[in-house]
Design a protein with these regions (language model features):
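Short beta-strand-loop/turn "lid" adjacent to the catalytic site in phosphate-handling enzymes
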Residues: 58-105, 123, 131-142
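N-terminal phosphate-binding loop and adjacent alpha-helix
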Residues: 27-66, 92, 96-101
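Short glycine-aspartate micro-motif
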Residues: 2-7, 67-72, 178-182
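Short glycine-rich, Thr/Ser-proximal phosphate-binding strand/loop in the N-terminal lobe
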Residues: 4-45, 203, 207-208
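Glycine-rich phosphate-binding loop plus the immediately following alpha-helix
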Residues: 108-115, 126, 141, 146-177, ...
Length: 239
């Protein structure tokens, strides 16, 4: 029997669940107040804080870390990777700590999972991280030769929903074409065809959402950038 800890660190919450095979033992979402998160200068500074919450949640629900057989986590902003499960190692954790593609709370997932797994001599995995890249080349072109669109999105949720749609329709995942939309702190839109996400509108170029400005008129962005009111860090935070 497998006992699996699942961790999903998001911008405003840390979601935790434990499964015995496919039976859910418990699930909880710990919401983080703005003033709590704003104590930390960098996202990775939240590592100890969030790991402590995960371990406390296990204890609260009567689950010993030593009983676990695997730790699964939401993946962070790694370089482009294929869809599916990827085993976590120290190199991955170092990449997310020192050279993430972008700053996001999901970068904490693999290091927390790896730490708990190492302490209990079990494997840790991430699944469908936000940097899954299966986009066709045509979808990466923009109106400026020096710029290319990037494959970034909420793949964990969108791919799961595409799989669920296929199953509910009595079809194979590889045989459906489906548009998926993730609506959370950021909104991403993807299209799946033949089992791959061939195009994606990430949360910085599509609809605005509670934590993202979304696609904006380029001339106005340029005006704000050169207004002298913002440095690059402040402007990125505003967007």
């Amino acid at each position: 029997m497998e006992k699996i800890l699942v961790i999903n660190p998001g911008s405003t919450s840390t979601k935790i669940a434990v499964y015995e095979d496919d039976r859910q033992l418990f699930v909880n979402s710990i919401e983080h107040a703005d003033e709590e998160i704003e104590k930390y200068d960098a996202i990775y500074d939240q590592y100890e804080f969030r790991k402590k919450l995960v371990l406390e949640e296990l204890e609260k629900n009567g689950v010993k870390a030593s009983e676990l057989t695997c730790v699964m986590s939401r993946g962070g902003l790694l370089p482009p990777v294929p869809a599916g499960a990827i085993r976590v190692n120290q190199d991955m954790c170092d990449q997310l700590r020192l050279h993430p593609v972008n700053e996001h709370a999901s970068n904490l997932g693999a290091p927390i999972a790896f730490s708990i797994a190492e302490e209990n001599d079990i494997p840790a995995f991430i699944y469908d991280p936000v940097t899954v890249d299966e986009m066709i080349q045509l979808a990466k072109y923009t109106g400026i030769p020096e710029m290319r669109r990037r494959s970034l999105g909420h793949n964990l949720n969108m791919r799961a929903m595409a799989h669920r749609y296929a199953a509910d329709s009595g079809k194979k995942f590889e045989d459906v074409t489906v548009i998926t939309v993730h609506m959370g702190g950021g909104t991403t839109v993807g299209v799946y065809q033949n089992g791959k996400i061939i195009d994606i509108i990430n949360d910085e170029e599509g609809p605005f959402s509670p934590e993202r400005a979304g696609g904006l008129p380029a001339p106005q962005v340029i005006d704000i950038a050169f207004s002298g009111e913002y440095d690059i860090k402040a402007l990125k935070k505003k967007l």
